[in-house]
Amino acid sequence: MAPVELEIVYQDEYFVAVNKPAGMLVHRSWLDKHETQFVMQTLRDQIGQHVFPLHRLDRPTSGVLVFALSSEVASQVMPMFAEHKMEKTYHAIVRGWIEEEGVLDYALKVELDKIADKFASQEKEAQEAVTAYKPLAKVEVPYSTGKFPTTRYCLMEMKPKTGRKHQLRRHMAHLRHPIVGDTSHGDGKHNKLFRNEFDSHRLLLHASELRFVHPFTNEELVMKASIDDTWQQLFTRFEWDEELVK
């Protein structure tokens, strides 16, 4: 497997941010022993210095991922990330049409991993989870997934106000508008349609932008990650303007 060259979207003496490819793990995990490529190790080799992750992105999600360039910076900045003193913007393609923007305040129970959390308590209280969402574009495709001859999809902008595990995926599923390509919370019929008709084999969730005040310069940092080839060909097919996600 050829080494991946990560796209660096921001770098200074304190931070480096990359556009994480969909399907790539952030760091080594004993749950995925067969994997050989990880963002942390690849980036370390690429820039020739150690990096320290400040937040996480699920394996199937693409987009902005920020690292500190020293453990001292990481320990100073981690609390800011943990307290959500930054604004994250995601884009997703979801089933159905959403007509109006809104804010979903729907608590989520801790989602335990069958293997990693085998001995964790199953009885934890649901945690507050808040997501602002806004529809940006619609499409109706001439393929059936049920009783109707066509199927509708929507391009969404989402800003999580809290950071629960799989929050955006679970919140959109709760609204009955699951994200396309979500194999754990989504709808298999729509995932299959996108695989077969649009050659889309990934979760259509992308971390487009991250904003926060630089803790050492006090300037506002805006880090952006562009969409990949799968997204671009969907925008072409659906006649959507890529400016919507810039």
From Swiss-Prot:
Role summary: Responsible for synthesis of pseudouridine from uracil-65 in transfer RNAs.
Keywords, sorted A to Z: Isomerase, tRNA processing
InterPro entries: PsdUridine_synth_cat_dom_sf (IPR020103), PsdUridine_synth_RluA-like_CS (IPR006224), PsdUridine_synth_RsuA/RluA (IPR006145), RluA_PseudoU_synthase (IPR050188)
Pfam families: PseudoU_synth_2 (PF00849)
Name of protein: tRNA pseudouridine synthase C
UniProt xrefs under Gene3D superfamilies: Pseudouridine synthase
CDD domains associated with the record: PseudoU_synth_TruC
One GO-annotated biological process of the protein: enzyme-directed rRNA pseudouridine synthesis
Organism annotation: Vibrio parahaemolyticus serotype O3:K6 (strain RIMD 2210633)
Positions annotated as active site in the UniProt record: 58
Record's catalysed reaction(s): uridine(65) in tRNA = pseudouridine(65) in tRNA
GO molecular function, a single term: tRNA pseudouridine(65) synthase activity
